[in-house]
Swiss-Prot record:
InterPro entries: Ala_DH, Ala_DH/PNT_CS2, AlaDH/PNT_N, AlaDH/PNT_NAD(H)-bd, NAD(P)-bd_dom_sf. It comes from Staphylococcus saprophyticus subsp. saprophyticus (strain ATCC 15305 / DSM 20229 / NCIMB 8711 / NCTC 7292 / S-41). This is Alanine dehydrogenase. NCBIfam families: alaDH (TIGR00518). Homohexamer. Trimer of dimer.
């Protein structure tokens, strides 16, 4: 199979979908890998690193898309839609529930769209989303601490406090991978941390994991309202695989927060959980204020730490890429149920129910689509 690795064009997206070691593994299996010039530079991989691993370097974006399978990091932008073609395998983060134009373009061009974020193991874990959730979660606490500084627009609070001064209060909505990793860093910074989740069993697991050092509270509108009001930093870390993120924090709740408090919405790439994060920000211009509250709503947070993120992503995606390349997408999807759950579009049909509901489009179940 011929596999293309484009250079990411999203604002300050410095990750690349495969490291040279990943390329080498595919080439060793007999596949051809084409890498767009400078695709790895943001992650400190030189073109020569890829050629030594067995890849070919091309100058034109069109060349790297004229392949059997394209591996990316982030969803294609509109200027890349022109390269879609029937039967092209697109293996990347798609987040289609918040991307109607992209969804329609994939369907119209009969692209085989396989989303990293909806590949799901029998225990319901998301192996290709987990590494980036870990990165984004850890970053969220660091970013929140940064923007609480006065010169960054915050209220001038040190999360860890000092002797005689109260710690900063952090509320994390969602106790999954991102929320758990946010809590680890927030605790490390010395903050007073509360985690809200809808699953009592998960709350018990978090109590045990953190040895009682975090407050765990059932997530419901009343508890969310109270925690949001009392917090200096609120982190949104809720995920429903494939579906649009639920709107859990209303504008009225945000209005009750103190001036200079900070919101970090990790779920913004799926629409966000805050009513007031109504637009996506960028690494160039990461925050905006509403009702005196600093909002951080960057959809590609791990792109700011590309070396770590690229290697972690490569480690997770490579085994699945090898299956797709060696077996072809149809047999690979039929043989691997976890991978088949990543299938979002095929032959002009939408195969993710959460996306179909979010965009009010017709849905075809995966089993029928693969017959």
């Amino acid at each position: 199979m011929i596999i293309g690795i484009p250079k990411e064009i999203k604002n300050n997206e410095n990750r690349v979908s495969l490291s040279p070691s990943g390329v080498h593994a595919l080439v060793e299996q007999g596949h051809t890998v084409i890498v767009e010039k400078s695709a790895g530079l943001g992650s400190y991989f030189e073109d020569v690193d890829y050629t030594e691993a067995g890849a070919s370097i091309v100058n034109e974006q069109a060349e790297v898309w004229n392949v059997d399978m394209v591996m990316k990091v982030k969803e294609p932008l509109e200027e890349e839609f022109q390269y879609f073609k029937e039967g092209l395998i697109l293996f990347t983060y798609l987040h289609l529930a918040n991307e109607e134009k992209l969804t329609r373009a994939l369907l119209e061009n009969k692209v085989v769209g396989i989303a990293y974020e909806t590949v799901q193991l029998p225990d319901r874990t998301l192996p290709l989303l987990t590494p980036m959730s870990e990165v984004a979660g850890r970053m969220s606490a660091q970013i929140g601490a940064e923007f609480l500084q006065k010169y960054k627009g915050g209220m001038g609070i040190l999360l860890g406090g000092v002797p005689g001064v109260s710690k900063g209060r952090v509320s994390i909505i969602g106790g999954g991978q991102a929320g758990t990793n946010a809590a680890k860093i927030a605790l490390g910074l010395g903050a007073d941390v509360t985690i809200l989740d809808v699953n009592p069993k998960r709350l018990q697991e978090l109590e045990d994991l953190f040895d009682g050092r975090v407050h765990t509270i059932m997530s419901n509108p009343l508890n969310i309202e109270q925690c949001v009001k009392d917090s200096d930093l609120v982190i949104g870390a809720v995920l429903i695989p494939g579906a649009k993120a639920p709107n859990l924090v209303t504008e009225d709740m945000v209005k009750e927060m103190r001036d200079g408090a900070v919101i970090v919405d990790i779920a913004i790439d799926q629409g966000g959980i805050f009513e007031t994060t109504d637009r996506i920000s960028t690494h160039d211009d990461p925050t905006y204020k509403k009702h005196g509250v600093v909002h951080y709503a960057v959809a590609n947070m791990p792109g700011a730490v590309p070396r770590t993120s690229t290697i972690a992503l490569n480690n997770a995606t490579l085994p699945y890429a090898q299956q797709l390349a060696s077996k072809g997408y149809l047999k690979a999807l039929q043989d691997n149920h976890a991978l088949s759950l990543g299938l979002n579009t095929i032959n002009g049909e939408l195969t993710n129910k959460g996306v179909a509901e979010a965009l009010n489009l017709s849905y075809t179940d995966i089993e029928s689509a693969l017959k």
